[in-house]
Structure formats: C-alpha cells, structure tokens
C-alpha cells in the first residue's frame, strides 16, 4: 500500500492553493466543496477566481510564492506550470510538515487527490496512486452509475430511526442490506420520485426480519482471489459467520466482511484438524442461532469437498441453504499450467479422481488406465506411488506424461513434470496442496504455459521443473 487512504475534515481549515489557472480552478472547487478556508496565490488568476473572491468564498494573494504563505495552513496544493515553483512549494511544505500535493508530480506529493463519488454522507474515493488514472476514472464512472444520487442522504436521514426501530445489530445490518440493494427504491430515487421512495422505505420497516439462520456453501476457487465468483464475493461480504478450511487462500479471506466471525476448520488428507461431524455441528448451531453462515471451501464445494454431506445434515434439521459453485482445482490448475484437460488429439474425456481412496478395489484401475483420457487426482500426494504402480500394472505406458501442480493459480504455483514411472519420485518434490494430472495433454504445457512466462516485479516467479529419465 503506497498511500494510506484517509478522509480529511477541512471545514473552516486554512488551506493554500498555489496557481491561478484552469487546473488550479478545479482543485479550488474541491476545497470549497469541503468547506475549507481557501487562500490562492498566483501571479495571474482566471475570471472564476476573481468571481469567487468577489463573493467572499476565498482569498487571493497576487505575486510569487514565498514559504511564509504556508503559516498556519493545514495543507497546500501546487498547481502551477512552473516546475521550480512546484518544487519550492513541496520543499517548503515538507520542512514545515504540511501535507502537499503537486499536481501530476507523484515524486513531489505527500498526499494524493482521488476520484470522488459524492453521495453525502457516503463518500467514495478511488485512486491508483497516479499509476493508472484511466482505470480509476472508469471505476468512478461505474460507481457513479451504480449509486443513485440521493441514496447517501436517505441513509443519513434514516440512521436514527433505524437505530431506534432495530435494537439488535444484526437486524440493523440486514435492514440496511435490504434497503441498499432494493432495485425499485433505487429506481425511484433515480427518477426523483421521493413519494414512491418513501413508500418502499415504509414497506421495509414493516416487513418482518426473520431470525431464522441460513447456510450458503461457497466455492472459493483454487487460490487466485480473482477467480472467486461475483456471487461468492457478495455472500462472504454479507456473512455473519464464515467457516473456512486451509485450502481457502489468504487473498480470498481478505475479502470477507471485517466484522464477520471467522471459524477455521482446516484439515488435510490423513489429518483432520476438526472432525467432519464437528464441522456439521458448527454449521447447524450457528444457523440455529439466526446467523447467516457462509461455509467457504477451496475449489468447488461439490467436487471432493464433502459439501453434499454437510448439506444433508442441515436438510435433516430444516435449515435453509444454497450453493454458490466455485472453479474447481482441476480446471484452475490445468489452465494456469497450460495443460488443457481435453484436446481432440489427446483426450476426449477427463476423470476427476480422489487420490486417497483407502479401500482396496475402490477405484477401477483398468478403466482409469484406458487411452485418450486425462486423469486428475485430488489429494493424491501420499498415494503417488500406489497410483503409479496401479496404472502401469493395468496397462498405462510408463512413459505417459504427468504433472504435479503445487499451490495452483497462486503466485507461489510450482509445476513439476515427468513420466508416469517417475510419479513417486516427483511427489517428493512438492507439498500439499498439489494436484496430479496424468495424460498426454501434459506434453502441451511447454507450448501453452502462459502463467509462468509472465514476469511481475511484485510477484515471485512461478517455478517450473522437468524430470528426465536417466
């Protein structure tokens, strides 16, 4: 984080603006809107500055900038076209520990002025730190279109009434969520139809807020937070409680609503930190207490995630539930490794297989060893030797290509590859969570490996290893 986002209360605070042109004029409008006591210093001023001065809205000081003008000022903005003047303003402000913004000069700036969406009392600031101004502008435009003009004012007017009407914090939050996502209310505000808007508000106050809890099963995807679905993001930002496991990345957890309770039930193959039965009970108890619970699972909750078992338990007690699918590890890891799971010349089908089946004969190895298909083993590291032995024993060529993807789709992704006869050895080079991909499609990785070929200064390089038969 290059800049600490902060909102300043500038009402009746003395601020200095150096510059009298059109750019300075835009900065002056912002300071005046914030209620600041504005002094403008320049050799020449636009007519608008003279108009403001005549109206008593700001003060003008004609002449060259001198450091003494900074006395008793809270902040200063330099908006001249003279680099030497801007540099002097910045240097003088720095010496006096006064925040200074030099327009279009990030190196001589101790604070930045973001794009602003004003829905007072709701204020939204968007900034790229000067590195992507077009992106910041596009985001502002989208937010401007998304938020009705009078929404913030309506929320401010209702605040005290909501506080009195709903004594429980969770009830207040749910009321606000309903109000702020009410499409017809938003349309009424956009149309300036305040009578209709008031009717929608009254309906929300009179509608019962159920105390009945619910559970939403959300797939967090394989690691990269950008692969979390929009609906998944909405759910984790509305949750009272988030129950999550170790396969959910820190980047995804950073998107969870800050005041939501977080319950870690991490587990891994062969070692259950929290027994499945206890996880079921946690979900049940939290929902029965009237909370909105998100069960957040890595990948997709219905693919080797035991999501079905958890929902069966909830269904038995009549707890409402829903499911938000996620990108499963097989899809994410293969895509980020440049390995297509199907290909007309290599594989006409793909099989997702659990790698820690413990009962002898549980897997149909003869079928798995068939040609023209791709195998993806989940949780298979500890059984890599068994997988290698069984597939070769049932007819799969020992030279079949394999790849192991560790921490797939994350910046720490590692891929090791080789032949089936080396699988047990390769498994010792990676750690969990890892995915095993078996099939001739792995040979396409060298051609299609887009992710590790990208070099980012702020990201560790993705590691690629290839084992060769001696």
Swiss-Prot record:
The family this protein is said to belong to: In the N-terminal section; belongs to the precorrin-2 dehydrogenase / sirohydrochlorin ferrochelatase family. In the C-terminal section; belongs to the precorrin methyltransferase family.
Active-site residues, record numbering mapped to chain: 245, 267
Reactions mediated catalytically: uroporphyrinogen III + 2 S-adenosyl-L-methionine = precorrin-2 + 2 S-adenosyl-L-homocysteine + H(+); precorrin-2 + NAD(+) = sirohydrochlorin + NADH + 2 H(+); siroheme + 2 H(+) = sirohydrochlorin + Fe(2+)
Lineage: superkingdom: Bacteria
Source organism of the structure: Yersinia pestis
Gene3D superfamilies: Cobalt-precorrin-4 Transmethylase, Domain 1 (3.40.1010.10), Methyltransferase, Cobalt-precorrin-4 Transmethylase, Domain 2 (3.30.950.10), NAD(P)-binding Rossmann-like Domain (3.40.50.720), Sirohaem synthase, dimerisation domain (1.10.8.210), Siroheme synthase, domain 2 (3.30.160.110)
Renumbered residue ranges of the record's region Uroporphyrinogen-III C-methyltransferase: 213-470
Amino-acid positions noted as binding NAD(+) in the UniProt annotation, renumbered to this chain: 22-23, 43-44
Enzyme Commission identifier(s): 2.1.1.107, 1.3.1.76, 4.99.1.4
Keywords: Cobalamin biosynthesis, Lyase, Methyltransferase, Multifunctional enzyme, NAD, Oxidoreductase, Phosphoprotein, Porphyrin biosynthesis, S-adenosyl-L-methionine, Transferase
Protein name stated in the entry: Siroheme synthase
Region of interest (Precorrin-2 dehydrogenase /sirohydrochlorin ferrochelatase), residue spans: 1-201
Gene Ontology terms describing biological process: cobalamin biosynthetic process; methylation; siroheme biosynthetic process
Pfam families tied to this protein: CysG_dimeriser (PF10414), NAD_binding_7 (PF13241), Sirohm_synth_M (PF14824), TP_methylase (PF00590)
InterPro entries: 4pyrrol_Mease (IPR000878), 4pyrrol_Methylase_sf (IPR035996), 4pyrrole_Mease_sub1 (IPR014777), 4pyrrole_Mease_sub2 (IPR014776), CobA/CysG_C (IPR006366), NAD(P)-bd_dom_sf (IPR036291), Siro_Cobalamin_biosynth (IPR050161), Sirohaem_synt_dimer_dom_sf (IPR037115)
CDD domains to which the protein is assigned, alphabetical: SUMT (cd11642)
Function: Then it catalyzes the NAD-dependent ring dehydrogenation of precorrin-2 to yield sirohydrochlorin. Finally, it catalyzes the ferrochelation of sirohydrochlorin to yield siroheme.
Chain residues that bind S-adenosyl-L-methionine: 222, 298-300, 303, 328-329, 379, 408
Residue numbers of Phosphoserine PTMs: 128
Pathway: Cofactor biosynthesis; adenosylcobalamin biosynthesis; precorrin-2 from uroporphyrinogen III: step 1/1; Cofactor biosynthesis; adenosylcobalamin biosynthesis; sirohydrochlorin from precorrin-2: step 1/1; Porphyrin-containing compound metabolism; siroheme biosynthesis; precorrin-2 from uroporphyrinogen III: step 1/1; Porphyrin-containing compound metabolism; siroheme biosynthesis; siroheme from sirohydrochlorin: step 1/1
GO function terms (MF aspect): NAD binding; precorrin-2 dehydrogenase activity; sirohydrochlorin ferrochelatase activity; uroporphyrin-III C-methyltransferase activity
């Amino acid at each position: 984080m290059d800049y600490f986002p902060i909102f300043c209360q500038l009402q009746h605070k003395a601020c200095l603006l150096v510059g009298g042109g059109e750019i300075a004029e835009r900065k002056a409008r912002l300071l005046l809107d914030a209620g600041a006591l504005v002094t403008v210093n320049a050799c020449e001023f636009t007519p608008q500055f003279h108009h403001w001065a005549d109206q008593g809205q700001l003060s003008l000081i004609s002449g060259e900038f001198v450091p003494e003008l900074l006395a008793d000022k809270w902040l200063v903005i330099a908006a001249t076209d003279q680099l030497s003047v801007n540099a002097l303003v910045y240097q003088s402000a720095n010496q006096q520990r006064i925040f200074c913004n030099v327009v279009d000069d990030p190196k001589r700036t101790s604070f930045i002025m973001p794009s602003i969406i004003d829905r007072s009392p709701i204020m939204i600031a968007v900034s790229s730190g000067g590195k992507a101004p077009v992106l910041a502008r596009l985001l502002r435009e989208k937010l401007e279109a998304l938020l009705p003009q009078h929404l913030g004012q309506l929320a401010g007017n209702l605040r005290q009434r909501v506080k009195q009407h709903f004594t429980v914090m969770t009830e207040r939050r749910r009321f606000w969520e309903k109000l702020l996502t009410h499409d017809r209310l938003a349309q009424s505000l956009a149309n300036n139809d305040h009578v209709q808007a008031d009717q929608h508000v009254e309906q929300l106050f009179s509608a019962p807020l159920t105390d009945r809890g619910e559970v939403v099963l959300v797939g967090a995807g394989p690691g990269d937070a950008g692969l979390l679905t929009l609906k998944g993001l909405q759910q984790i930002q509305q949750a009272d409680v988030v129950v999550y496991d170790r396969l959910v990345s820190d980047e995804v957890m950073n998107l969870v609503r800050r005041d939501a309770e977080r319950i870690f039930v991490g587990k891994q193959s062969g070692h259950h930190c929290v027994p499945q039965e206890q996880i079921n009970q946690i979900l049940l108890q939290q929902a029965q207490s009237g909370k909105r619970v998100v069960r957040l699972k890595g990948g997709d909750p219905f693919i080797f995630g035991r999501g079905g078992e958890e929902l069966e338990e909830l269904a038995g007690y009549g707890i409402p539930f829903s499911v938000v699918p996620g990108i499963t590890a097989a899809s994410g890891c293969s895509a980020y490794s440049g390995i297509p799971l199907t290909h007309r010349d290599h594989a006409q089908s793909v099989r997702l297989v659990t790698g820690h089946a413990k009962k002898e004969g549980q897997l149909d190895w003869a079928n798995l060893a068939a040609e023209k298909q791709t195998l993806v083993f989940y949780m298979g590291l500890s059984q890599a030797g068994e997988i290698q032995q069984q597939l070769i024993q049932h007819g799969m060529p020992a030279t079949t290509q394999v790849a192991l993807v560790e921490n797939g789709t994350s910046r720490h992704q590692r891929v090791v590859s080789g032949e089936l006869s080396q699988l047990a050895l390769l498994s010792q080079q990676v750690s969990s969570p890892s995915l095993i991909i078996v099939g001739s499609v792995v040979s396409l990785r060298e051609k299609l490996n887009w992710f590790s070929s990208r070099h980012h200064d702020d990201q560790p390089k993705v590691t690629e290893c290839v084992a060769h038969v001696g």
